[in-house]
């Protein structure tokens, strides 16, 4: 059985690194949304985790019940974060499999 060529191995590693960087860039540029309260609160974030938009339905704005609004905002943030993690795992899956 022939020994693998070192230059071939290095070329494959370089190609994999370039593809990994491309996918990481794609994830960073993506926008992921999450919601809570059947869509009453929505959060949009970039793949970097930066929150870019929060939308709150007027019906949940009650000065006498701030706790519910806080819970909904937190829930929407958590939903968006979970969606982002799932998306990143999906995109990075081939690299995890290739590395063992």
Swiss-Prot record:
SUPFAM superfamilies: YbaB-like. Disulfide bonds: none annotated. It comes from the Bacteria. Gene3D superfamilies: Nucleoid-associated protein YbaB-like domain. GO terms for cellular component: bacterial nucleoid; cytosol. PANTHER family: NUCLEOID-ASSOCIATED PROTEIN YBAB. HAMAP family: DNA_YbaB_EbfC. Binds to DNA and alters its conformation. May be involved in regulation of gene expression, nucleoid organization and DNA protection. NCBIfam families: DNA_YbaB_EbfC. This is Nucleoid-associated protein ckrop_0143. It comes from Corynebacterium kroppenstedtii (strain DSM 44385 / JCM 11950 / CIP 105744 / CCUG 35717).
